[in-house]
């Protein structure tokens, strides 16, 4: 594992795809980092596009404890929305910012091992790091991998993986520093104020109180898992906030620090 955190793993949520200005700003930030020799790996979701595509095909979106339920008949549509449309929208924004990128999925390069997470969720996967050679080769060229959260089991079955968990596995694989970027500035308390730092006990208390729930619960628990595994803080921050992106480019702490 790298000890100098030379790879910055940026996980972006699906809401970014609906904000051209946000995408442009984030890609400009990434371009500046790459120009300074900072290796950047981007992992993305695309929930809003998935919802749109399912609705267009007369299918319903169902979630269980913040995770998307993926029946087999929905898998081709979900894979198309995430590994196809969402990935290429982000790659287009990267190209516009002058970034050389590689669009990929978790299924590429023997990068992760995937299995069914929970039968109740259908074709939802859980991934563990496997082989970092493919990613490390791309990063060594100064290119930016843009990875969707579609994985594949050994039998060729596609799986839909929560993008926060996907980013966690890839951060472990490359020994990188993980930043979970969404449309909120970090974890908020019951009064809507930013919490600058959280540890495992504080997270458990806030989950019990219902302050951290649904998608943010999944996000924070993924961040805590990788923070504990790597022995360093994981950041939960916003792509909407220009000042946070500038600070991020300088290597400063932004948003909420999830402590190991």
Curated annotation (Swiss-Prot):
Keywords carried by this UniProt record: Amino-acid biosynthesis, Arginine biosynthesis, ATP-binding, Cytoplasm, Kinase, Nucleotide-binding, Transferase
InterPro entries documented for this protein: AceGlu_kinase-like_sf, AcgluKinase_fam, ArgB, Asp/Glu/Uridylate_kinase
GO cellular component: cytoplasm
Positions of substrate binding: 46-47, 68, 160
Compartments, as annotated in UniProt: Cytoplasm
Marked site: Transition state stabilizer: 11, 219
Pathway the protein takes part in: Amino-acid biosynthesis; L-arginine biosynthesis; N(2)-acetyl-L-ornithine from L-glutamate: step 2/4
Name assigned to this protein: Acetylglutamate kinase
């Amino acid at each position: 594992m790298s000890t100098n955190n030379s790879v910055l793993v940026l996980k972006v949520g699906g809401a970014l795809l609906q904000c051209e200005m946000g995408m442009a700003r984030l890609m400009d930030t990434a371009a500046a980092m790459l120009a300074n020799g900072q290796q950047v790996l981007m992992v993305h979701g695309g929930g809003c596009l998935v919802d749109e595509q399912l609705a267009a095909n007369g299918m319903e979106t169902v979630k269980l404890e913040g995770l998307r339920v993926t029946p087999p008949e929905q898998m081709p549509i979900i894979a198309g929305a995430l590994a196809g449309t969402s990935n290429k929208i982000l790659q287009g924004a990267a190209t516009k910012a002058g970034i050389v990128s590689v669009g990929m999925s978790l299924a590429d390069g023997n990068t992760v091992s995937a299995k069914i997470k929970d039968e109740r969720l259908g074709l939802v996967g859980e991934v563990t790091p496997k082989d970092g050679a493919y990613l490390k080769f791309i990063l060594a060229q100064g290119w930016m991998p843009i990875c969707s959260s579609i994985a594949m089991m050994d039998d060729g079955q596609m799986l839909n993986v929560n993008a926060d968990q996907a980013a966690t596995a890839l951060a472990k694989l490359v020994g990188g520093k993980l930043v979970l970027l969404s449309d909120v500035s970090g974890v908020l308390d019951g009064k809507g104020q930013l919490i600058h730092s959280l540890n495992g006990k504080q997270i458990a208390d806030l989950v019990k109180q219902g302050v951290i729930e649904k998608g943010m619960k999944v996000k924070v628990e993924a961040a805590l898992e990788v923070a504990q595994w790597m022995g360093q803080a994981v950041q939960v921050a916003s792509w909407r906030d220009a000042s946070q992106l500038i600070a991020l480019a300088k290597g400063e702490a932004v948003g909420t620090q999830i402590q190991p």
